[in-house]
Design a protein with these regions (language model features):
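Terminal accessory carbohydrate-recognition/targeting modules of carbohydrate-active enzymes
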Residues: 1-267, 271, 297, 304, ...
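Non-catalytic carbohydrate-binding regions of carbohydrate-active enzymes
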Residues: 2-17, 394, 456-495, 515
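Flexible, solvent-exposed coil segments and beta strand-coil junctions
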Residues: 111-115, 339-342, 486-488
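The feature captures the catalytic groove of carbohydrate-active enzymes
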Residues: 129, 200-229, 233, 238, ...
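Conserved oxyanion/phosphate-binding beta-strand-loop segments in alpha/beta enzyme cores
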Residues: 259-296, 409
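Long, well-ordered core segments of solenoidal/helical folds
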Residues: 276-287, 317-339, 381-399, 413-414, ...
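Internal amphipathic alpha-helical repeat/solenoid segments
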Residues: 287-306, 344-345
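Alpha-helical support elements that line or immediately flank enzyme active sites
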Residues: 297-330, 503-515
């Protein structure tokens, strides 16, 4: 029994099915994202969205969608769906959906009269390529499938308007065609495992709307280019694979490529397996190293999010090697910043004052999940560098005072995760002594002392850490614990912010807390 399955009643009800979105990534920054009925509801949605290094590595939508049509006895049955001006949905392909499940890969089952057709989508790991396998499960008469590619070739946060600047040519390649609408973009190769018939039928499809953008009050209408369509006859029991990528592929390799990729997938047969799959979607591996993307479809690599999410996205799902490889990339950028002040080109926010503290916290989780011995062997040098860097007041915006408490300046630029800005100023200007910064600092000192406890060469370092711990324990309580039994959010001079925020939960939830 599939853990994630939606039946016909839900799928044909757009009020229920459109809000349900799915995401597939290749762990190299490319993704496929849409609603479970295949109707794009955001401008960031697309069948193939890839980062382009020559364009600041921002994600660009190359292939927005692929509309399928089942043809029997000359009668077309359109399986696609788009929203057009005025809230009109056309074609209404969702009415043919009988089931959607996502146990190993997203699979949609359509029924058109006597025809039962399944569609399964899979992203190739580490490659900018998506495969879609169509299987004709049942048919009582000759059947042909027609495919119309909707091309965008735009940055994922922009919209495309009909224009005359595009390159309309489609180059014939093995079992398909290749297209590149604008200079500077990679060529999109659209190929099949079976030889299709290509019909050149270029049109702009105008006035496509994205309802989520409409609700957000941002631009939501665009025009998409459809250069023509493919036609492929299919027999009962037969499967056809469609490939979209930025490199040409041998059509004969598509079946083997699909089977190899699906064999490596974790079935979503439980809530844990769903979380495991979701965690791995955010891995980003390229020539610069291994990273964690902060979110799709508009996330980037952020230092704080990397260290905060690293244990949960790796150690919690038994991916120790991924923790170590991502930590190696992130810690190298952190050490470079601590040594030279040079910002990272890939990991944004490496200069924020709490980043070293979250790095130590992530290593602490490694010690708990793997072993203290392993953590000491791999990360003791890094922990020592971080502690000394902070104690020597080398960070430009994190200062240690006489009570071993740390303060920061956040009046003009946000320094914590509460980083919303309005009119060039932080919405909440948290400045001075921040409760979670000091709790993280206390925790880091205690952990560093524990990690170096049996290290004869680091006894002086161990004693120094414990001295700082003893120095700040009572001042922390005196500064943050108020008469109402909870913690102030931050203290700046004579002002103590009484706002109840989750930052105090960090302070009480750490392994070592000055409140113990």
């Amino acid at each position: 029994m599939s853990y994630l399955k939606f039946d016909k009643n839900l799928m044909i009800n757009l009020e229920q099915s459109l809000p349900k979105e799915m995401l597939r990534t290749n762990q190299s920054g490319a993704y496929h994202c849409t609603s479970i009925v295949g109707c794009n509801t955001r401008k960031q949605h697309g069948l193939l969205v890839i980062p382009i290094p020559e364009m600041e590595n921002k994600p660009h939508v190359l292939l927005s969608s692929l509309d399928e049509t089942v043809i029997q006895h000359g009668a077309p049955f359109n399986l696609g769906i788009h929203r057009y001006s005025g809230g009109v949905y056309s074609p209404n392909g969702h009415k043919y959906i009988r089931e959607f499940d996502c146990e190993s890969v997203p699979r949609t089952t359509y029924r058109v009269g006597g025809v039962i057709l399944t569609k399964e989508k899979i992203f190739i790991s580490g490659e900018n390529r998506i495969l879609i396998r169509y299987t004709l499960v049942e048919a009582h008469s000759p059947t042909t499938l027609q495919f119309r590619p909707f091309l965008a070739f735009r940055e994922s946060n922009e919209l495309c308007m009909a224009n005359s600047s595009l390159n309309t040519a489609c180059e014939e390649v093995s079992n398909g065609v290749a297209s590149c609408l604008y200079n500077g973009y990679p060529t999109l190769y659209m190929q099949f495992s079976h030889k299709p018939k290509w019909v050149n039928d270029p049109h702009w499809y105008n006035g496509i709307e994205y309802v989520k953008d409409l609700e957000r009050g941002v631009p939501y209408t665009e025009d998409l280019w459809v250069p023509g369509y493919f036609e492929v006859p299919i027999k009962k029991g037969e499967s056809i694979i469609f490939s979209a990528g930025i490199k040409e592929v041998s059509p004969r390799s598509l079946n083997k490529m699909y089977e190899k990729e699906i064999a490596s997938r974790t079935c979503r047969s439980s809530f844990y397996n769903c979380l495991k799959n979701a965690a791995k979607q955010f891995y980003l591996k390229d020539k610069d190293g291994d990273f964690i993307l902060s979110g799709y479809p508009w996330g980037t690599v952020l230092a704080r999010n990397t260290f905060m999410s690293l244990p949960g996205t790796t150690l919690a799902i038994d991916h120790k090697d991924d923790f170590e490889s991502i930590m190696a990339t992130a810690s190298a950028e952190l050490v470079k910043y601590m040594g030279t002040g040079e910002l990272s080109a890939r990991i944004h926010g490496i200069d924020l004052p709490d980043i070293p503290l979250w790095a130590v916290w992530a290593i602490q989780q490694y010690a708990k999940n793997i072993s203290t011995t392993a953590a000491h062997e791999k990360y003791m040098d890094l922990v020592e560098k971080i502690i000394n860097y902070i104690l020597e007041n080398n960070h430009p915006n994190l200062q240690v005072d006489g009570n071993a408490m740390v303060s920061t300046i956040g009046t003009s630029t946000p320094v914590s995760w509460m980083n919303s800005m309005m009119w060039g100023k932080p919405v909440v200007p948290r400045t001075g002594y921040l409760v979670e910064f000091n709790a993280l600092w206390y925790n880091a000192l205690r952990f560093a002392a524990m990690l170096s406890e049996n290290d004869e060469e680091r006894q002086e370092f161990h004693d120094m850490c414990m001295a700082q711990v003893e120095k700040m324990a009572q001042p922390f309580v005196d500064m943050f614990l108020n008469d109402y039994g909870y913690l102030y959010d931050y203290v700046n001079g004579t002002y103590a912010d009484p706002s109840v925020r989750p930052n105090m939960a960090i302070a009480i939830g750490l392994d070592y807390s000055p409140l113990d």
